[in-house]
């Protein structure tokens, strides 16, 4: 009897250890994805939501078999650095970097953790990869490079009397610098006059907008994070001067721009999420994953803004009015 009791105790102890071991392995198997987002605005939020949905659609759900740590830097470089340091010290399994400054921050902290980016215009110019075809770094992802020439063509169709086009952008954002250069070429190729005003932060946006409306018949805004967050400010100035504003993406149009032919950022984020699934499943590594781009572009026209500035939308564009 005594031997039987001892056997039961020993068997119980073994079972406890086995169960504890299984629990430990289960906890260890839950991979952590850190999301570092540069700033909060419609486009970047949509990209994040699309990314998470793609994971969920493929069986990766936050709190179940993965852990997602989402951090927003609120357009602050010191916040970006702090968040990046935290992700590295916590040894997360993967990072989603939303917008160029976020990707540059985390990529500058680690060469080991896989990084996927989204809402990034030019990975090569941002020094995140060696080439779009074969990154050869721990970074890959999706690009939000716009059809800039076609956006300038849209401006001309909506504002045919425009002679001078002003481009407003943030001089500290590599993605905006690249887009401004492309826009300049497209504008001048049409025989129009190009002018520009730059800002370094959101506090300068109102004054910069007041400056550019004095010399431009219409304004072009690239996909610029500072400007996307300050669209209501830009709208407040341009609606008074009745200056049309063509934007780089639909979220900017929804918040006060006139029109765009732009990317669906939710779809872009979703595509990035599908890339993440490949990495999580060990089927691919960022170093050999080509940068992917949007599969299509959508027209979006803000009818309320058109009415406010007295602009008549051509009949062949009325189907694209979103509000």
What do these predicted ranges mean?
Residues 168, 174-249:
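Pocket-lining segment of extracytoplasmic ligand-binding domains
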């Amino acid at each position: 009897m005594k031997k039987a009791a001892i056997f039961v105790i020993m068997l119980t102890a073994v079972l406890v250890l086995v169960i504890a071991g299984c629990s430990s392995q289960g906890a260890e198997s839950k991979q952590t994805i850190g999301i570092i987002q540069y700033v909060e605005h419609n486009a970047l939020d949509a990209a994040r939501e699309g990314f998470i949905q793609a994971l969920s659609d493929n069986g990766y759900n936050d709190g179940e078999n993965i852990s997602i740590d989402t951090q927003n830097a609120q357009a602050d470089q010191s916040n970006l650095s702090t968040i990046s340091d935290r992700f590295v010290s916590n040894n997360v399994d993967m990072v989603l970097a939303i917008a160029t400054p976020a990707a540059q921050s985390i990529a500058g902290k680690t060469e080991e953790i896989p990084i996927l980016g989204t809402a990034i215009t030019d990975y090569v110019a941002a020094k995140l990869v060696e080439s779009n075809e074969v990154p050869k770094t721990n970074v890959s992802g999706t690009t939000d490079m716009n059809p800039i020439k076609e956006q300038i063509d849209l401006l001309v169709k909506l504002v045919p009397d425009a002679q001078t086009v002003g481009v407003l952008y943030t001089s500290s954002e590599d993605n905006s610098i690249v887009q401004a250069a492309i826009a300049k070429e497209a504008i001048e190729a049409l025989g129009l006059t190009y002018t520009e005003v730059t800002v370094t932060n959101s506090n300068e946006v109102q004054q910069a907008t007041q400056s550019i409306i004095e010399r431009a018949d219409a304004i072009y805004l690239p996909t610029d994070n500072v400007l996307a967050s300050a669209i209501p400010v830009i709208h407040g100035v341009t609606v008074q001067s009745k200056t049309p504003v063509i934007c780089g993406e639909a979220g900017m149009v929804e918040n006060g721009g006139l029109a765009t032919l732009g990317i669906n950022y939710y779809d872009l984020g979703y595509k990035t999420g599908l890339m993440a699934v490949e990495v999580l499943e060990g089927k691919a590594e960022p170093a050999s994953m080509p940068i992917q781009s949007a599969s299509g572009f959508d027209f979006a026209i803000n009818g309320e803004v058109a009415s406010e500035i007295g602009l008549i939308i051509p009949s062949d564009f009325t189907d694209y009015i979103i509000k």
